[in-house]
From Swiss-Prot:
GO terms for biological process: iron-sulfur cluster assembly. HAMAP family: Fe_S_insert_ErpA (MF_01380). This is Iron-sulfur cluster insertion protein ErpA. The gene is erpA. GO terms for molecular function: 2 iron, 2 sulfur cluster binding; 4 iron, 4 sulfur cluster binding; iron ion binding. It comes from Legionella pneumophila (strain Lens).
Amino acid sequence: MASVDVSQNTSDINFSVSAADKVAELIKEEDNSDLNLRVSITGGGCSGFQYGFSFDEQINDDDTVIIQQCSDGKSSVKLLIDSMSYQYLHDAEIDYIKGIQGEQFVIRNPNAKTTCGCGSSFSIGDEDDL
């Protein structure tokens, strides 16, 4: 398992403080401090790949663990990304936004060559670009 602490800017994936705050809020609602946010990429969607968000207590051997401190300065949360998904998320930003269309987790992924209107499906160019 690779462990990366984004508070020390050692990760090539940006897990925002606003995303960490929302994850902490959701974990508190579930009343299970062992939960971590897992981001994954699977085949499917209208553009070829799709993002998945889930909570997971299990940290697998091939997971990259990104730790982000919350805005309160006291608590932190963990983001888990499996090795297959990690290669497609290089230099991406995982954020939580509030806007006119509601609230949602978003991934700004520079590796995505095209995205669909829903924002949860994307395609990549040549795998050599990764």
